[in-house]
Amino acid sequence: MHAREWIHGVYLGVVMLVVSATAAGQTGSVQTFVLDNVTGIDARNAKLEPAKFQGKKSVRLTTDARDGGLAILHGSDLQDGTIEADLAVKTTTPPGVRMPGFTGIAFRARPDGSEFQMFYLRPKNALSDDQGMRNHSVQYVSEPGFGWYRLRREWPFVYESYADIQPDTWTHLKIEVAGRTARIFLNGSTKPSLVVDGLKSSMLHGAVGLWGYAGEESYFANVRITPAAAQPVKNGADAAGEWIVRYASDAGPFEGSMKLTRDGSKVTGTWSGALGENKAISGTWRDGYVELAFPADWPEGRDGAPGPAAAFLEGWFDDSSAKGRMRVEGRADGRWAAERKVH
């Protein structure tokens, strides 16, 4: 969330929140956190208090930490399933923030808060007459490594969206997590406000947390965690080999092949197909997640000037298949999918 909108790898203030839960810790059981008290709280760089906001019993989270505070629900755990919660933010004007008001729910988090993924809301952005700011109403981050700034610069408007939400009032949130995909639904809508297909973290399960921003008041109530059957996803798939790639972009479809080799975290290889022949690929691998780049040749007959262009791919490999996002700088954006070529 802008220079102080969200974290840049700086340690978060973490609060370990102990609450009563229904069948807490039992795999396959629903966990309910009413959040009407703060018994057993260990607060660091954040403060939790029982409160009423607009007549609803809740927990109020405040923090003076520049990059916000996180409260982990003790005993919570989810791989795949849904998280529901009521949340609200009392907006103030932290220094340097153009549109104040941040609050969110973290998932698949480490108990110490050192790694997590999160959807967060920015209700005042939804009221802006600047469409660019309106498109930042709901955002996704994965920390460490994939904060708002990096995701927005590398993949504009893919990890954030507009939503019809209001500041200083309760919002009902539901997050659906399935494998490497997560969706957020707001205020009972059956249509997601944001879909992240290709979650950035290799954490496949973890705790649920509450997040608030410096200088503001975030309120949380009625967290309900409902597990579902886990998707058959695993980490560590190798990218090495030959892959047949299909790229569905806003400039039309493209096809090609990648021949990749891997040495530790380093990936090299070649691309051949619609965007050029024997183009040198370079990039990185982490637990099956790759970020690759190669110099492309933009063809005649497509929107945009023909000629040299830079192509970028990111995504996950899962044994015999792979998928993610791809862009050709200044020319096209979309999703790619690949199948391993069997010789």
Model-derived regions, located:
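Bacterial N-terminal signal peptides
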Residues: 9-21
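Central antiparallel beta-sheet cores of small beta-barrel/beta-sandwich binding domains
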Residues: 234-343
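Extracellular glycan-recognition regions
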Residues: 26-238
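Short stretches within intrinsically disordered, low-complexity N-terminal or propeptide regions
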Residues: 5, 23-25, 48, 73, ...
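Generic C-terminal helix-cap and adjacent flexible tail
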Residues: 4, 229, 341-343
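Intrinsically disordered, low-complexity proline-rich regions
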Residues: 8-12, 98, 288
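N-terminal secretory signal peptides that target proteins for export/translocation
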Residues: 1-8
